Amino acid sequence: MPRIKSAIKRVKIAERNRLRNKATKAMVRALMKKVTSLSSAYAANPQPETLQEIQAAMSAAFSRIDKAAKTGVLHKNTAARRKARLSRIVQRSLAATSAS
């Protein structure tokens, strides 16, 4: 444990930031999981309400991912990759339902 006052403060700040970053990453994962589950549900049973839910969930996920990248929780390339994956998943489920 540090003895110097400024080092003690830095330990407290690092712990606070770690917990905040952990919560942000968990929220991003939860929103991504919600989008993927909604898109698979839409592929199995296409309903217009489900499509609206997908769009709302995707918007929320994109917003949270962008905020995480802006604050430095996620790297900008990681954020771009996650957004691209979500878009690809949704596009595939929409294409599968329109083809059948």
From Swiss-Prot:
PANTHER family: 30S RIBOSOMAL PROTEIN S20 (PTHR33398), SMALL RIBOSOMAL SUBUNIT PROTEIN BS20C (PTHR33398:SF1). GO terms for cellular component: cytosol; small ribosomal subunit. One of its GO terms (biological process) is translation. Keywords: Ribonucleoprotein, Ribosomal protein, RNA-binding, rRNA-binding. The lineage of its organism: Bacteria, Bacillati, Cyanobacteriota, Cyanophyceae, Synechococcales. It comes from the Bacteria. Coiled coil: none annotated. Binds directly to 16S ribosomal RNA. Belongs to the bacterial ribosomal protein bS20 family. GO terms for molecular function: small ribosomal subunit rRNA binding; structural constituent of ribosome. This is Small ribosomal subunit protein bS20.
